[in-house]
Amino acid sequence: MHAGRFTSMKDTAFFINVGRGETVKLDDLAAALSNGAIAGAAIDVSEIEPLPPEHALWQCENLIVTPHIGSFGSDTDIERQRVIVDNAQRFVRGEPLRYVIDKALRY
């Protein structure tokens, strides 16, 4: 994804990348988010990992970053199920949940 593709999207569109980080130009994504070319984005991967603290994407309030956890496979499916069950039990007991996104920090 690059600037031309972002500008061809509807301004109400949300971009999600859980695939390969190098398929998205981060500076172009930051520009698209900042100038309103798209409504928002969520990325689990980036061409540079971890995303540098000074990168412009961290200033985009319409972005959510997850720590490269979107994956596929029997091992990850089992772990995902464990986390869901554990968080459900924690919720019932009134305990803090694991892996909660801090909406203020957007990750």
Please describe what each predicted stretch is.
Residues M1-G4, E22-V24:
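Beta-loop-alpha module in the N-terminal Rossmann-like domain of NAD(P)-dependent dehydrogenases
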Residues T12-Y107:
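Rossmann-like dinucleotide-binding domain for NAD(H)/NADP(H)
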Residues H2-R5, I84-D86:
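A short, gly/pro- and small-residue-rich
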Residues R5-F6, L57:
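Hydrophobic anchor residues at the C-terminal helix/turn of individual leucine-rich repeat
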